[in-house]
From Swiss-Prot:
The keyword Zinc does not apply. It comes from the Bacteria. Pathway: Amino-acid biosynthesis; L-methionine biosynthesis via salvage pathway; L-methionine from S-methyl-5-thio-alpha-D-ribose 1-phosphate: step 3/6; Amino-acid biosynthesis; L-methionine biosynthesis via salvage pathway; L-methionine from S-methyl-5-thio-alpha-D-ribose 1-phosphate: step 4/6. This is Enolase-phosphatase E1. CDD domains: HAD_EP (cd01629). Bifunctional enzyme that catalyzes the enolization of 2,3-diketo-5-methylthiopentyl-1-phosphate (DK-MTP-1-P) into the intermediate 2-hydroxy-3-keto-5-methylthiopentenyl-1-phosphate (HK-MTPenyl-1-P), which is then dephosphorylated to form the acireductone 1,2-dihydroxy-3-keto-5-methylthiopentene (DHK-MTPene). InterPro entries: Enolase-ppase_E1 (IPR023943), HAD-like_sf (IPR036412), HAD-SF_hydro_IA (IPR006439), HAD_sf (IPR023214). It comes from Synechococcus sp. (strain CC9902).
């Protein structure tokens, strides 16, 4: 019996366009100024160091080329890291260091009113209903936990952050690896078969299913991937209830 519902964000509860047309461009434009203003803040300085460590281990050809060229010029560390992070943004790479810093940048945007998140209408309704019915709700996204919380706190219809009990990002593991979902089930103190995972990515659904979770594939209009494979399909979150009985 399903007792826990674990959800992806982009393409599941939130339109892909909000992420690609609002969040990503905002972080890209605000990144340099943010790092300049906060480079001496201990928490941000640590994130800059984390990004540097990640860069040193990045075997991508473009990353290596940028690293070698940056070593030949005299420039503050935060500016070198900014150029690396911009490369990651341009290549849409799933970087934990980038996601952590983006979360800090977005926090400024949300708290100053420059960003308000948009969720699907059926997401508001479904999440509130499931919470009221006693289901334990969790989020698993490549975006940092801080960014996840902000997205649900500053929605156009108010703060719904408190509907969720669990938050997971790539610190627990890659979303396309089975062991990540095993770790999530352990963290939730729940048997894998009691967790329903909903995502718009078939590789993620495959990994979750391999770990023993029940999966639903979010096949929304406008989602970039439309390949459910053998996973049951939902068109919106209103279709989920039939699988909770």
């Amino acid at each position: 019996m399903i007792s826990h519902i674990l959800l992806d964000i982009e393409g599941t509860t939130c339109p892909v366009t909000f992420v690609t047309e609002t969040l990503f461009p905002y972080a890209q434009l605000a990144l340099k100024d943010f790092l300049e203003r906060h480079k001496d803040d201990p928490s941000i300085s640590q994130l800059i160091n984390n990004a540097e460590d990640e860069w040193m281990q990045d075997q991508d050809k473009q990353s290596a080329t940028l690293r070698h060229s940056s070593e030949e010029i005299q420039q503050p560390k935060h500016l070198k890291i900014e150029s690396y992070l911009q490369l990651l943004i341009a290549s849409d790479k799933k970087s934990t260091a980038l996601k952590d810093i983006q979360g800090k940048v977005w926090k400024e945007g949300y708290t100053t009113g420059k960003i308000t998140s948009e969720l699907f209408e059926d997401a508001y309704e479904g999440l509130k209903k499931w919470h009221k019915q006693g289901f334990t709700l969790g989020i698993y996204s490549s975006g940092s936990v801080e960014a996840q919380r902000l997205l649900y706190k500053y929605t156009s219809k108010g703060d719904i952050e408190n509907l969720f009990s669990h938050w997971f990002d790539t610190h627990i593991g890659n979303k396309k690896e089975q062991r990540s979902y095993t770790a999530i089930a352990s963290s939730m103190a729940c048997k894998p078969q009691n967790i329903l995972f909903i995502s718009d990515n078939s590789d993620e659904c495959d990994a979750a299913k391999g770990a023993g979770l029940f999966t639903l594939y979010s096949l929304r209009e406008g989602n970039p991937q439309q390949e459910p494979r053998d996973h049951p399909i939902i068109i919106n979150l209103g279709d989920v209830d039939q699988w909770l009985k």
